[in-house]
Every structure is written in C-alpha cells, then in structure tokens.
C-alpha cells in the first residue's frame, strides 16, 4: 500500500508512493484454513468486487494481485486467467500480477509422454513445509497414472482417479487430492 499510495508523512515527504493522493480498495481473501487447494474462486470474487466498486464510483482502478501461487495452465486458458482478461476489459481497469520470487526452486516442470512411457519428476519439499500443492495438466482425453515416493522410499500409487476429495497418509504426511 505504501508503494502505491504512501503519502510520505513518516519520512517528512522524502518517500512517497507513486499515487500519494490515490484511494485504496483493499480486499483480504481471509485465512485458507489449511485446505491446501487453490483459492481462485475467492480471488475472482475479490476482483469482481473491486471492478464493480470502481464502476459504481466512476473511477479508474489499478488492481495489484500478489497472490503467491503457481496454479493453472500458464497459457492463458485456465478459468482464472480468462476471468482476469475479461475483468481487464471492463471499464478503466488495469490488472498487474506478480511473477513470483521462487528463484531457482524448480517449482515447474513440463514435458510430453508417449503412450506407455513413465517419467520420474523430483519434487523439492522442505522438511517442515506445512502444505504443498501440485497440479498436473493433461489434454482432456489423456489418461495418466500418478504415484508418489517419499524420501524414505515409501511408495503410494498409482493413485486412482475418483470424483471428489481423497485423503490418506503416507508416513507423517497427509495427502489431500
């Protein structure tokens, strides 16, 4: 908020935001409650609220989304990406999305598999990491199997594809699918 609309009062005018006379609409998504799933529905509701409020006030709006996730297809076709594109075309709306600060953590992998081919994809999960989310994107008609192997060598899977939530434990780790 200070970078956007800081008025410089605490620094005797030396440090001010880019729009010190700007007005802010701040929307907090709330506590995720440890469920570990993407909260894109709440994000879309928040953006919708801001765009509608700006239209009501007849003001332009610049929305900064620092959401801290790597979900989605990353090719502009996922529901949240298409929603943000549409929102940016509404009224006088500008949307900025952070590009991440994961550095060299190898949070993404991509590739193609031929029928019958297997591939191991190592995941870097910290020892005390409380939650971890993984998305696998395939073409609609593809059928894949997923198995997990812990650092201790315990293996789970292939995991069956079923509708609804699946919960199970591997050692001390709870998996929520």
Annotate each language-model stretch with its function:
Residues 27-29, 47-75, 98-99:
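Short acidic, glycine-rich surface-loop motifs adjacent to enzyme active sites
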Residues 7-8, 54, 112:
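Active-site catalytic pocket residues across diverse enzymes, especially alpha/beta-hydrolases
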Residues 5-10, 45-46, 116-118, 127-129:
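Short amphipathic alpha-helical surface micro-motifs
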Residues 1-39, 58-62, 90-92, 130-132, ...:
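Subtilisin-like serine protease catalytic core
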Residues 24, 45, 151-154:
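Amphipathic alpha-helical scaffolding segments
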Residues 2, 41, 45-48, 52, ...:
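Solvent-exposed, polar/charged alpha-helical surfaces in well-ordered, non-transmembrane soluble domains
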């Amino acid at each position: 908020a200070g970078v956007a609309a800081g008025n410089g009062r605490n620094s005797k005018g030396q440090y001010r935001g880019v729009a010190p006379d700007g007005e802010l609409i701040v929307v907090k998504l709330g506590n995720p409650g440890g469920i570990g799933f993407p909260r894109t529905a709440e994000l879309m509701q928040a953006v919708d609220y801001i765009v509608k409020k700006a239209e009501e006030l007849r003001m332009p709006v610049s929305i900064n989304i620092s959401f801290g996730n790597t979900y989605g297809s990353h090719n502009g076709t996922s529901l949240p990406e298409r929603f943000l594109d549409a929102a940016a075309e509404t009224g006088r709306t500008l949307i900025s999305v952070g590009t991440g600060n994961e550095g060299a953590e190898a949070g993404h992998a991509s590739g193609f598999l031929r029928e019958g081919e297997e591939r191991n994809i190592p995941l870097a999960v910290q020892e005390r990491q409380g939650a971890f989310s993984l998305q696998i994107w395939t073409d609609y008609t593809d059928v894949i199997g997923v198995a997990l192997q812990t650092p201790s060598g315990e293996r789970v899977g292939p995991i069956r594809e079923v509708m609804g939530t699946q919960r199970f434990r591997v050692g001390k780790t709870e998996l929520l699918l």
